[in-house]
């Protein structure tokens, strides 16, 4: 009887330790995957030249990172362009994120420079959480993250904000480079006169 109790106790302890080890291995793999995506995002954004390319890279990486579709609206000439859906799968299937109501919420975010949509006080019945891609008062676009069964936890939300800030910085740098190039062409034309 004593041997049986000791064997039972040791098997319970070994099973518990094995389960904890398996959980830690899974969490470590998930953290490594997220870190790799963030590193790839940074590297790809450094290479990108146009604002459109920067937005596509950002949305594709966010879709991979969160394993859900991402809605993006680029700011063009002071207005939001038509939305695009970037899916974590090969083909984006759900167009319900691009309805007129959802576009109105994205425009509100663009105008007010505040987050809105699901999980917020503004437009809480929306299908997505909308955030502005911005630096200061300059807004470069709006990103929508669908609020599925599971909402973003605080860690995922902080990663989302970090990626959006990096996207905004890359877009700001691209805009500055375009303006510098235009000014150089104007100066060269003035010299030739």
Predicted regions and their residues:
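Hydrophobic alpha-helical transmembrane segments
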Residues: 4-8, 54
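Signal-transmission/dimerization alpha-helices at domain junctions
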Residues: 7-20, 159-183
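Short hydrophobic/aromatic-rich motifs at helix boundaries and adjacent loops
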Residues: 10, 27-32, 101-102, 169
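Short amphipathic alpha-helical coupling elements at transmembrane boundaries
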Residues: 23-36, 40-43, 60
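GAF sensory domains
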Residues: 40-173
């Amino acid at each position: 009887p004593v041997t049986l109790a000791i064997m039972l106790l040791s098997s319970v302890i070994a099973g518990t330790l094995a389960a904890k080890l398996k959980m830690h291995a899974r969490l470590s793999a998930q953290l490594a995957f997220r870190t790799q995506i963030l590193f790839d995002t940074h590297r790809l954004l450094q290479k990108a030249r146009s604002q459109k390319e920067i937005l596509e890279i950002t949305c594709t990486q966010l879709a991979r990172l969160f394993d859900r579709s991402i809605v993006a609206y680029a700011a063009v000439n002071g207005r939001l362009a038509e939305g695009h859906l970037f899916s974590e799968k090969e083909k984006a299937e759900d167009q319900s994120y691009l309805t007129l109501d959802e576009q109105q919420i994205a425009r509100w975010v663009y105008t007010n420079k505040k987050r809105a949509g699901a999980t917020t006080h503004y437009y809480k019945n929306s299908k997505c959480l909308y955030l502005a891609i911005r630096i200061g008062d300059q807004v470069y676009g709006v990103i929508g993250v669908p609020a599925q069964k599971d909402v973003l936890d605080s860690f995922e939300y902080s990663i989302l904000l970090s990626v959006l800030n990096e996207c905004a910085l890359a877009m700001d740098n691209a805009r500055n480079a375009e303006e510098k190039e235009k000014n150089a062409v104007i100066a060269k034309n003035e010299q030739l006169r």
